[in-house]
């Protein structure tokens, strides 16, 4: 009888211990939503996450790049070297030159234009100092580099021709440039003065602002 009671007490103690241990064990942590997903769902989500970062980088790469306009050249040589001459209207010589047409599209204030002219040992240099419109045509004006204040250069841009007038202490020049081909004709006003008095000595044309040339040919 005593043994039976002891066995019953031992069984009760062991059962109580097991129940207490079960009550004291912490509940297993709840799985995260990602862990609860099936392996197939996780495998499908992985490529989407991997593509998200490159897509953002691609968006940044496709952002428009600011367009920068190149600065105008400080010095432009329209033509250089000795000019070829031919007899023009009324026997007055014309001197021929060749200009790169694109150069006349890049005129800018402060720019120095350089060109060789008949009767001058060194190329003429003139700096563009002002611009305005006259009769709908752009006009540029400037003075000679290291020249006298009375010396000047005027450029009138037409759609077909560009007219350039140069006034120096030694005489004046009229220049006509074909905008499309760049072919250029230079007329020395001293030749016109000599033509008016063929029997006299060579006389430099007086320094003066040239009378307006006919407007450049328009399309």
From Swiss-Prot:
* Transmembrane regions listed in the UniProt entry: 4-24
Q: What is its main location?
A: membrane
Q: Name one GO molecular function term.
A: peptidase inhibitor activity
Keyword vocabulary terms for this entry: Cell membrane, Membrane, Metalloenzyme inhibitor, Metalloprotease inhibitor, Protease inhibitor, Transmembrane, Transmembrane helix
Where composition is biased (Pro residues), the residues are: 209-219
What compartments host this protein?
Answer: Cell membrane
Q: What induces it?
A: Constitutes an operon together with PA2783. Its expression is up-regulated in biofilms, while it is poorly expressed in planktonic cells.
Which terms in the GO cellular component ontology are assigned? extracellular space; plasma membrane
Which segments carry the region annotation Disordered? 191-219
- The annotated regions of Basic and acidic residues compositional bias extend over 191-204
This protein's membrane topology, according to the annotation, is: Single-pass membrane protein
* Protein's job: Inhibitor of the metalloendopeptidase Mep72. Forms a protein-protein complex with the protease, which is the product of its coregulated adjacent gene, and probably prevents premature protease activity until the protein has been secreted.
State the name under which the record lists this protein: Biofilm-associated metzincin protease inhibitor
Q: Which organism is it from?
A: Pseudomonas aeruginosa (strain ATCC 15692 / DSM 22644 / CIP 104116 / JCM 14847 / LMG 12228 / 1C / PRS 101 / PAO1)
Taxonomy of the source species = Bacteria, Pseudomonadati, Pseudomonadota, Gammaproteobacteria, Pseudomonadales
